[in-house]
Amino acid sequence: MAVGKNKRLSKGKKGLKKRTQDPFSRKDEYSVKAPSTFAVRDVGKTLVNRTTGLKNANDSLKGRIFEVSLADLQNDEDHAFRKVKLRVDEVQGKNCLTNFHGLDFTSDKLRSLVRKWQTLIEANVTVKTTDDYLLRLFAIAFTKRRPNQIKKTTYARSSQIRAIRKKITEIIQREASSRTLAQLTKLIPEVIGREIEKSTHGIYPLQNVHIRKVKLLKSPKFDLGALLALHGESSTDDKGQKVEREFKEQVLESV
């Protein structure tokens, strides 16, 4: 074996080793705020790269969508199967102000509702709120046994399904088109489902009636004042208020 330099071993790397910078050192933390229609306002934190040159951090945050459990927003475990989508519309300081962007059910809840020996009835309605939000609401309902029923199955006839679907459409249209988006988000979880169940009892008894999904199709032109009012931060009501103070006339002592 020839004795000599092993080029592979002696060959060193050119230049010094680059320092690896922690990517999180270039990021800032912002708080995500839910609208005042929910009981809990603090959703969580989000990270974004700091403003450098022409790239503004606020522009990167606007439009971000967060999916939050309604149970966390309302401090109520009964709503754990509902997921609310919130979209960042404005950034004020270190706070991201969000607005309602949609609602959905968890897949495990939807699977648990579907059972044998009953009829599943679905309907979807496109509605416009009074503040010009275009929404599509998806309703779901299941038939149930009548009192003192002996038969195992609870299948509804096609004519009954059509009548129930028509009733669902009418109720959703009436409730949604006469309210703002903020008012509608309060009704969606429970109120509309109970109203449908009560109204369709004469056609066929229903159970597990829910608005399972809400899809935001179109938003009106962005209005900062409306968003601040939604978050309870509007200062329009405080302007121009008369301040009541007692006026005491100063009497100068005669010299």
Swiss-Prot record:
Bias-annotated ranges (Basic and acidic residues): 19-28
Primary site of residence: cytoplasm
Subcellular localization, as worded in the UniProt entry: Cytoplasm
Family annotation (InterPro entries): Ribosomal_eS1, Ribosomal_eS1_CS, Ribosomal_eS1_euk
Modification N-acetylalanine, positions: A2
Biased composition range(s): Basic residues: 1-18
GO CC terms, sorted: cytosolic small ribosomal subunit
Any one GO biological process: translation
GO MF annotations in UniProt: structural constituent of ribosome
Membership in a protein family: Belongs to the eukaryotic ribosomal protein eS1 family.
Protein name (database record): Small ribosomal subunit protein eS1
Name of the gene this protein is made from: RPS1
